[in-house]
Amino acid sequence: MSCEFSLKTFDELTSVDLYHILKARSQVFVVEQNCAYQDIDEVDFDCLHLVAYKNEKLIGYCRIIAPNSNKSKLKAAKSHNSAATVEGTTPSIGRVLILPEYRGDGLARQIMTQAIKYCRKKYGKKPIAISAQTYLIRFYESLGFTPYSEFYLEDGIEHVDMVLSLRKKVKAKNQRSSSTKILNFLLLVLALLFIAGLIYLMV
């Protein structure tokens, strides 16, 4: 599905933008998931808000949370494990949603890809953290995220912390480079043996 993306700070959002964002978040995270919790929080003030539009209608959304934001600090303060520490010092992506009628067309992957790109542009090569609902683990793994915490309940829904790091990509790239060099070397050896064989037959 083709769509347009808009990335704004909280101060750049118009009242209409904010209305549609909060309406969508309430529709998905409160009504659809039957989860009574306070969706609006102070974290929104420090976030980048990424919206997917089709024909000027909001159809998907996520927010990019800055490193050392209020949310990250609060989570780290509540826990002594390494998972909270990682999320507290890295950017994270949250409130990822697609409106029900637009699901199944790859839009979630597009939004996450855009969010990751913006994280890299703004925060460099820092790992990117997410708090994922466990039924979406495979989806996030397909984007390169790996779990780094035990399962836990958040507002009555099972979650797991996941992180996207550049290390594995760099390692995989180095492995591919090494494999290519070995293959080229073997091809060179075979070519030399072939030439040597031809010379032997000619003699």
Indicate where each model-derived feature is located.
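Conserved N-terminal entry element of GNAT/NAT acetyltransferase domains
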Residues: M1-V16, K171, S179-I199
